[in-house]
Amino acid sequence: MKLNKFYLPFFLIFFTGIIFPQSTSDKVVDVKVKVPKVVSSNKITEAEIILQIKNGWHINANKPLDENLSPTVISFKNNPNIQIKKIIYPEPVITKLQFSQSQMALYEGEASLKIQFMVKKDFKAKALKVDGEVQYQPCNNQTCLFPTSKNFSISLKIKK
């Protein structure tokens, strides 16, 4: 039986979905958050977002070398009590994989991102929760899964 060229892409997408179901992609990365025990309002504070990438997998860096690849991006839900000053992404590993013709910028193992933020000075409560999301595309040496995201929260105790 010959596969028509029109049907081949659909067959490949369906077949890849069976081998690597979408639910696999959100199990490739765990997100851990490290923050100081207490933060002061109106002062720049740094938090660490640690992406723990499962062995045998990698994710594209924040600035992939190929514009067609999905970058790893951290974002935060709008919160009027906090101001994100800067997100510092780690240096990627530059390597060439079996399926790639050119070099790629990747994170593998553990990637540590720094978030510089400031709680607004007129914030009066003793605690604050900041919700964020990391978007990434997990890949191994044979294939890439669909881009996915994982939510995380930063819980802050505010010094009065």
Residue ranges of predicted features:
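Bacterial Sec-dependent N-terminal signal peptides
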Residues: M1-S25
